Amino acid sequence: MVLTDDELKYIEEVLGRKPNELELGMMDVMFSEHCSYKSSKPILRNFPTDGPDVILGPGDDAGIVSLTDEYALAIGMESHNHPSAVEPYGGAGTGIGGIVRDIISMGAKPVVLLDALRFGHMSNQRSKYIFDYVVKGISDYGNRIGVPTVGGEIEFDDNFQYNPMVNVVCAGLVKKDEIVYGSAPIVGDVYLLMGGTTGRDGIHGVTFASEELTSNSEVEDRPAVQVADPFTKKRVMEATYELLETLDIHGVKDLGGGGLTCCLSEMADKGGNGSLIDLNKIPLREENMTPYEIMLSESQERMVFAIDSSDVEKAFEICKKHDLAHAIIGNIIDKREFIIKDDEEEICHAPNILFTEAPIIEREAKEPEKIIEDVEIPEVDVEEALYKLLSSENITSKEWVYSQYDHEVQLRTIVKPGDDAAVIKVDDETSFTIGTDCNSTHVLLNPYDGAASAVLESINNAISMGARPIALVDCLNFGNPEKPEVFWQFKEAVSGMSDVAGKFNTPFISGNVSFYNETEGVTVNPSPIVGTVGVVENTKIKTMTLKDDGDVILVVGNTYPELDGSQYYKHIHNVVQGYPPKIRLEENYNVSTTIEKLIPKYNDNITSVHDISKGGLIIALALMSIKSKKGVNVNISNIPSTTELSQDDKLYSESNSRFIITVKEDALTTIEEALSKNNVAYSVIGSVCSDGFKISNDNDVLVDCSVEKITKENTTTIEKQMA
């Protein structure tokens, strides 16, 4: 039980009595950090949530943003970290299942999945096992329900050895006049429970997710992990679409964390009403289940609909057609109370407030002591460092992962995995871009700048595809919030994210907080994962693929001596300390928005775009060459900067808001004038060629190799480890 003594006292004061066993279990679930956001809610209020394209912000199963006159996008992001640590295949699969149901609940048809993952190093057998089976769980579930998994990102670090991060995004298209919400607004309506039956799996799933893991969690907490059932999910999806098309559905919500307790209490309370539930009507999978088990079960593939009683017969016909369990389990009442009956006996009778408004906890925040050692960074051969970086776990190609995903089902995927973001077709004129980002090492070193940079990087990835960024989603993964140092990280991260999102007018429309990502004193690197939705005309889509020999290569944006936290320091010199790249908000905004405006204006003359991030300029250039199977001839002597740079700074710095763009040679003057007019620093550094990857600094040739060589270094690491 996660209820504190103060919370128990509060419950008794509101009830005027002690809660019975069922009520106590239900409130324990709803007071959990996972359901109540009792630690994070005051901090999350700093996020901007309104914008010109926002239809629905945070608070429902998903956020909704406008894409075209006809279509909107429902999008959500969730974590399934604890379950995936205990049972990686099932934990990852049910994570996908839950976020897909969230999108269906809004009336939308899921068209895309992404995953943002964190693991320990593959040299550790347990981390390797978790990595393998998380990917299999995501792949099997997504492929079987026919929703493409089109992207995401992965990091490997020792701090994720015991606590992997499994964050999943789903987005779906919905016509604006067909949106439904997770509320029960009409007194007298009945609750239709449809889908899978209710069993004993997943009981205490949310309280399990609101505590630290231990060395015994793999055995002790396995029953708290839900059982995935993608085949039932497919039928649930089809039945839901038919119910929404056939009946006047007043509200829909999926049964995720907290099961029936969470679903019914939230639906009724959002509608300003209450619920009267008949426990005996709930379809069960197992015999002799107690009321406690029934109300706390998190069995998968279940949905609740608020419908008019006159539509029950039609609803039942649809459920039977799809061979799904179904029942009317109660009705909506005009008192804001949650009442459950077992036969004629009332076994729960409490006000909604005890399920939907847990008291806020004011957590202490304390900046941890920062220790920086004097470390000598020896000079290394640039070409050898390039090969090591390209083959390092965090930069190597993730094709082994995304090749297991069906990313072309539904035939909407225009730009496939491996670019700055995925591009998904809406109609003949419009597409949307979607991607996720976070550099967990940068957030560890400075949560404000690191988290702000995650938002900026995600926005820049959308811009690199030619899109206009319109909205953000997030999943905030941190350690134990009861520890002041962890809560300080959380507050600083949210502050940085809010500042960047506000500046770019890209509101957060949906998100999730995952605390207690710790195991016996080992805390994960703080990981606020950010996803950005962008809108792009189909004729204006850009990619990082180099196009024609002779195209001119420009670096746009200033580089600073910012190597702390870089992949170069981490993987070449085994150094992780100091201060990560800073946010220079006005400068970053000017560079990014200038590129955003130039791409559609000079669409035919700008031939490729890629933002510079992990690994710095040299890695960005290498990945463009690998992607396109074309070469580059570049000199880094005059890359833009406001300060003196070392050779390492020029090659490996991970400063924010920098882009590589290639332009047609006869358009160079026009592009240069446009950049200068907007006071954006840039430099012409070279040109595209048919083969050869050559990097020079003044007269010194630093790298001179074939594209085939760098491709080989970049594409075999995971395959070798997982063989």
From Swiss-Prot:
Pfam families: AIRS (PF00586), AIRS_C (PF02769), FGAR-AT_linker (PF18072). Pathway: Purine metabolism; IMP biosynthesis via de novo pathway; 5-amino-1-(5-phospho-D-ribosyl)imidazole from N(2)-formyl-N(1)-(5-phospho-D-ribosyl)glycinamide: step 1/2. Substrate binds at residues 79-82, 101, 226, 298-300, 514. The active site is at residues 34, 80. Mg(2+) 2 binds at residues 102, 254. It catalyses: N(2)-formyl-N(1)-(5-phospho-beta-D-ribosyl)glycinamide + L-glutamine + ATP + H2O = 2-formamido-N(1)-(5-O-phospho-beta-D-ribosyl)acetamidine + L-glutamate + ADP + phosphate + H(+). Its main location: cytoplasm. It is found in: Cytoplasm. The keyword Cytoplasm applies. Mg(2+) 1 binds at residues 78, 512. One of its GO terms (biological process) is 'de novo' IMP biosynthetic process. Part of the phosphoribosylformylglycinamidine synthase complex involved in the purines biosynthetic pathway. Catalyzes the ATP-dependent conversion of formylglycinamide ribonucleotide (FGAR) and glutamine to yield formylglycinamidine ribonucleotide (FGAM) and glutamate. The FGAM synthase complex is composed of three subunits. PurQ produces an ammonia molecule by converting glutamine to glutamate. PurL transfers the ammonia molecule to FGAR to form FGAM in an ATP-dependent manner. Monomer. Part of the FGAM synthase complex composed of 1 PurL, 1 PurQ and 2 PurS subunits. Belongs to the FGAMS family. This is Phosphoribosylformylglycinamidine synthase subunit PurL. It comes from Methanosphaera stadtmanae (strain ATCC 43021 / DSM 3091 / JCM 11832 / MCB-3). The gene is purL.
